[in-house]
């Protein structure tokens, strides 16, 4: 019974980990674009604002996913401890 309870939690944990990795890659790409000195020219203001907004949104989403992952991981650890003990 505990194994059956554990399975969906592990699946959820894996899904969240995959999403975190995806968001981290997207964030790295945005930050790499923000490192381009040419982006700070007056002609690039619209693009700069867009990238800054995207960066903020990615960070917000990543923070939420990480918090959810921590909760799920605690549940997984708790169920695994019950199963072992």
Give the role of each language-model region.
Residues 1-85:
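Charged, heptad-repeat coiled-coil alpha-helices that serve as long linker/dimerization "arms"
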């Amino acid at each position: 019974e505990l194994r059956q309870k554990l399975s969906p939690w592990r699946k959820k944990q894996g899904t969240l980990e995959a999403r975190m990795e995806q968001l981290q890659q997207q964030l790295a790409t945005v930050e790499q674009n923000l490192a381009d000195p040419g982006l700070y020219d007056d002609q690039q203001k619209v693009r700069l604002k867009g990238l800054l907004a995207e960066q903020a949104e990615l960070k917000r989403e990543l923070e939420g996913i990480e918090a959810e992952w921590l909760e799920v991981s605690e549940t997984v650890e708790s169920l695994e401890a019950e199963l072992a003990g």
